[in-house]
């Protein structure tokens, strides 16, 4: 290397130092000053890791004074260059710029500049960059984007609802599935899609206080969405950052109570401009035409201000008609303006539903049904379909006509677009519940303490006394102190120990009402029989609960028993277990359903055993009988439970408080009657049309199958592991489909997106991720993959490389130039551009004559024939063919332009076809179905107009290139 004072060089190892100047030389060392970063470096002259910076004719260079020069001639004098040319700003020609006055901030961002400046990257990084671009393009184009990456089983009806709603602009819908069908997951999938496509950036979730943590965990664990819980304390803290605390976070979760109690916080939440509002347990919002409740008014005000609204609620029949109307009013007050009109309109749908039921069961349509259908759909639409149904056509044709008729009716169906409701009856795949009621003898210690408590508890209300009598172990401890070991003699504990020992190979979930009971049961199992158990209660932090859940889920060396308190178990599901023990009983049928729902969920593969050990001659025995004989609540889901409970509570509570009573048999008999009546009313009121629409039928199956195909994508595994390698993460195989990924010392960036500081255990397998909550489920949508790709792009990894092609059929020294261009439309994410024109890579492979060989030579197979070159040799090779590389880059533009035009045209076609057909459908429906909002149509028209402009203006640029030189050995 020959150095001279005033020459400009850049560092190969620290490219962020900027442009350096040689300021001192002696026999063995050279000193460079990097003015941009105010650093000096002293290198050995013989092998300094620096590259000489020389610009060529045609380049534009910046001076230290801030003006730029278009280079027309390069003059050398004793190893130092002067550039002659025209100033870009004043257009003055013949200007000279000595290299010592070049701007210190010059960065080599263009791939060709980096190549000539010797900042040559590793070959495998170039390959990784190209694969990242290609994979990202595929992901953005996929119609399933936003549905593949969540940690949830592939359950057709959930995927259908999420796919249907998640793609809408500002969806306003009511999710009213029965319990155990996964409304929270549906809402999460919709949020996830809206976030990924840029349709929603600010989201507010309002839930009952007890469910805050459940939502926080579900959003984080299943969808990698990090919400912040806002309460008074958090708002006071956030006040220092902004006047409105709600503006300090994009994703906020808070309780309805919090907004109801504080007018100031409610008003701040209103002003914070959300894109999407999600309300769980919306059936608790009370409404009467004259007097809506405060809670209802809070949500109503938020729903008026927010474009997208998801309400999660119990089934409409459980709510009653008026209450159901009140929910719909929140979604669209213009459409659902009057309760009487709504009832009339609903009644009109009854015959339609009958007609559809007839169609579904393949019966012939009666004339009355035909007339009814013709009233709803125009005659020219339905006549040919009726003919097809009655002709002797093939089964397929008849099925097609039937489906088309049903689809048309669905679209016109009053609330089909705003209401989704699945029932267990309409969805297959639920386990059978085997109920084991086990009457056990009451220990004498309990009899005594309960008798004394009965004498002393004179001041208690019947309800408080009834509650107390349900938990004899607590009464005993009141007298004997907390340390007393009731579990030494309680017959339920003895039974539990025997059951656990008999079922050594099974995981067993035990639920008790109180945290203290759960903790003491764990102690009993451990001390009396050395059984591995873990506890789960409301006093534990989320991380502690996660650890307990993971310990329970572990196949080998995990806990056999998990003991939960009532509140602690909310929202946690353990489908991998099928043994449930209720150590005591809750007061409320809904809580009972919630307990069984921990295991009895869609996705449970086996039948469930429900064990109810209860003490005879206690309130537990009465409650067990009432649940079993009055409601059949153990064996079946009980949507009517609450209504029956409300009807009999006044008569039932005194009996529970007294531990028995004459009237019990009558109450059980009457409860069973009322339950039967209510259930048959529900059955009659079942809206078949709505159910068919909600579970998505064939279409739902196809979506699930399509996503299942992408699971286990080996391409993802290879790509993700290379990506982690390139960025410098440490990987360790843990078996059982698991890897541990931790930050290493020499990482490209100080912290890696989506990876906790202490590292994470990851899996690419959906089933493993479902049974192990402590693992991250890695998919193309996971922040660790998305963030890693963004890092590659922004840090300029792999933008230029040099490789050798060992091929004796070609002369030594033959060169090829592989160029990757990207087509990019500069448009806001929320415009939806990525569906039609995401960043699109175009690969060009130029031979020395300037021919494009990319169509004959595929990337992966070509790459396998190449081998890497060390940086020093690579720099020499580049210097020797610099002129040819310039020529080929210029020639490649002619090859890339027609492909860019083709990409633009294809994107326009896709966009017009997709959005115009959606627009035509909405306009046609608007004529017959008042549920189509004007705003939806306006937004679509506007979107088509904007996207047409964005796509037309899409530009291309050179993203990366690789020089390939032929060698023979």
Curated annotation (Swiss-Prot):
E.C. number: 3.6.4.-
Motif DEAH box in this chain: 280-283
GO MF annotation list: ATP binding; DNA binding; helicase activity; hydrolase activity, acting on acid anhydrides
Metal-binding listed as a keyword: no
GO biological process: regulation of DNA-templated transcription
Domain Helicase ATP-binding, chain residue ranges per copy: 164-334
Domain Helicase C-terminal: 492-646
UniProt binding sites for ATP: 177-184
Superkingdom, natural source: Bacteria
The keyword ATP-binding is assigned to this record: yes
CDD domains: DEXDc_RapA, SF2_C_SNF
Keywords: Activator, ATP-binding, DNA-binding, Helicase, Hydrolase, Nucleotide-binding, Transcription, Transcription regulation
Protein's job: Transcription regulator that activates transcription by stimulating RNA polymerase (RNAP) recycling in case of stress conditions such as supercoiled DNA or high salt concentrations. Probably acts by releasing the RNAP, when it is trapped or immobilized on tightly supercoiled DNA. Does not activate transcription on linear DNA. Probably not involved in DNA repair.
Subunit structure of this chain's protein: Interacts with the RNAP. Has a higher affinity for the core RNAP than for the holoenzyme. Its ATPase activity is stimulated by binding to RNAP.
Entry's family note: Belongs to the SNF2/RAD54 helicase family. RapA subfamily.
Protein name: RNA polymerase-associated protein RapA
Gene it is expressed from: rapA
């Amino acid at each position: 290397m020959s150095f001279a004072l005033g020459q400009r060089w850049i560092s190969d190892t620290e490219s962020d130092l900027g442009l350096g100047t040689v300021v001192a030389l002696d026999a063995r060392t050279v000193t460079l000053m990097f003015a941009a970063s105010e650093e000096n470096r002293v290198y050995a002259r013989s092998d300094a890791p620096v590259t000489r910076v020389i610009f060529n004719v045609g380049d534009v260079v910046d001076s230290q004074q801030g003006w730029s020069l278009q280079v027309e001639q390069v003059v050398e004098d004793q190893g130092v260059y002067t550039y002659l040319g025209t100033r870009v700003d004043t257009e003055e020609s013949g200007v000279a710029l000595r290299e010592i006055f070049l701007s210190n901030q010059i960065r080599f961002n263009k791939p060709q500049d980096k190549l000539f400046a010797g900042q040559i990257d590793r070959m495998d990084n170039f390959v990784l960059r190209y694969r990242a671009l290609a994979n990202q393009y595929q992901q953005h184009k996929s119609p399933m984007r936003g549905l593949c990456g969540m940690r949830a089983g592939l359950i057709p009806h959930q995927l259908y609802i999420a796919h249907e709603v998640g793609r809408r602009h500002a969806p306003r819908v009511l999710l009213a599935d029965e319990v155990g069908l996964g409304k929270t997951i549906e809402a999460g999938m919709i949020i996830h899609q809206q976030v990924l496509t840029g349709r929603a950036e600010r989201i507010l979730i309002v839930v009952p206080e007890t469910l805050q943590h459940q939502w926080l965990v579900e959003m984080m664990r299943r969808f990698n969405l990090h919400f912040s819980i806002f309460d008074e304390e958090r708002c006071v803290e956030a006040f220092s950052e902004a006047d409105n605390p709600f503006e300090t976070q994009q994703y906020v979760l808070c309780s309805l109570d919090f907004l109801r109690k504080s007018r100031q916080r409610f008003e701040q939440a209103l002003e914070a401009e959300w894109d999407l509002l999600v309300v769980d347990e919306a059936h608790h919002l009370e409404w009467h035409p004259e007097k809506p409740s405060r809670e209802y008014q809070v949500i109503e005000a938020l729903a008026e201000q927010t474009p997208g609204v998801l309400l999660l609620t119990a089934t409409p029949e459980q709510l009653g008609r008026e209450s159901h109307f009140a929910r719909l009013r929140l979604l669209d007050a213009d459409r659902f303006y009057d309760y009487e009109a709504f009832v009339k309109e609903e009644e009109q749908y009854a015959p339609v539903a009958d007609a559809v039921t007839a169609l579904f069961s393949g019966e012939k349509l009666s004339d009355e049904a035909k007339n009814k259908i013709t009233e709803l759909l125009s005659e020219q639409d339905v006549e040919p379909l009726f003919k097809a149904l009655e002709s002797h056509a093939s089964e397929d044709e008849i099925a097609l006509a039937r489906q088309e008729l049903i689809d048309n009716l669905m679209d016109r169906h009053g609330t089909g677009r705003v209401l989704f409701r699945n029932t267990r009856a309409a969805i297959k795949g639920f386990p059978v519940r085997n109920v084991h009621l086990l009457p056990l003898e009451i220990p004498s210690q309990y009899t005594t303490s309960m008798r004394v408590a009965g004498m002393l508890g004179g001041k208690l209300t019947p309800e408080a006394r009834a509650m107390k009598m349900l938990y004899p172990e607590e009464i005993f401890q009141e007298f004997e102190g907390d340390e007393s070991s009731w579990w030494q003699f309680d017959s339920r504990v003895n039974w539990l120990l025997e059951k656990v020992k008999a079922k050594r190979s099974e995981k067993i979930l035990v639920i008790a009402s109180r945290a203290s009971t759960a903790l003491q049961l764990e102690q009993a199992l451990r001390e009396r029989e050395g059984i591995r158990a873990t506890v789960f209660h409301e006093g534990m932090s989320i991380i502690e609960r996660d650890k307990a859940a993971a310990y329970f889920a572990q196949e080998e060396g995990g806990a056999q028993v998990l003991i939960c308190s009532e509140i602690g178990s909310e929202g946690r599901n353990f489908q991998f277990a099928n043994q449930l023990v209720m150590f005591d009983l809750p007061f409320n049928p809904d809580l009972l359903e919630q307990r069984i729902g921990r295991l009895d969920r869609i996705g449970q593969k086996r039948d469930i055993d429900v064990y109810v050990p209860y003490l005879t001659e206690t309130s537990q025995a009465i409650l067990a009988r009432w649940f079993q004989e009055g409601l059949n609540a153990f064996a079946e889901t009980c949507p009517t439970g609450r209504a029956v409970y409300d009807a009999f509570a006044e008569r039932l509570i005194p009996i529970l408080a007294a531990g028995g009573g004459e009237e019990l048999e009558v109450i059980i008999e009457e409860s069973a009657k009322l339950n039967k009546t209510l259930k048959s009313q529900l059955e009659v009121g079942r809206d078949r049309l709505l159910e068919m629409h909600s579970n998505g039928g064939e279409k739902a199956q196809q979506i699930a199958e399509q996503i299942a195909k992408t699971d286990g994508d080996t391409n993802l595994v290879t790509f993700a592991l290379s990506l982690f390698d390139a960025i410098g993460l440490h990987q360790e195989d843990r078996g059982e489909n698991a890897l541990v990924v931790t930050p290493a010392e020499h990482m490209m960036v100080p912290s890696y997106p989506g990876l906790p500081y202490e590292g994470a255990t990851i899996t690419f397998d959906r089933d493993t991720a479902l049974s192990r909550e402590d693992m991250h489920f890695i998919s193309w949508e996971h922040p660790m993959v998305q963030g890693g790709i963004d890092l590659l792009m922004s840090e300029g990894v792999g933008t230029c490389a040099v490789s050798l092609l060992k091929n004796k059929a070609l002369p030594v020294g033959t060169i090829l130039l592989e160029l990757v261009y990207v087509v990019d439309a500069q448009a806001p994410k929320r415009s939806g551009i990525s569906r039609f024109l995401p960043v699109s890579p175009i690969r060009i492979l130029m031979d020395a004559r300037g021919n494009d060989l990319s169509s004959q030579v595929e990337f992966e197979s070509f790459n396998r024939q190449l081998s890497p070159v060390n940086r020093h040799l690579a720099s020499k090779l580049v210097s020797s063919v610099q002129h040819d590389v310039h020529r080929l880059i210029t020639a490649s533009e002619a090859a890339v332009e027609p492909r860019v035009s083709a990409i633009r045209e294809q994107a326009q076609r896709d966009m017009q076809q997709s959005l115009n057909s959606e627009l035509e459908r909405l306009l046609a429906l608007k004529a017959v179905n008042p549920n189509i909002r004007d705003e939806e149509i306006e937004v679509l028209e506007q979107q088509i107009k904007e996207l047409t402009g964005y796509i037309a203006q899409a530009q291309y640029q050179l993203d990366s290139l690789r020089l390939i030189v032929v060698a023979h050995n």
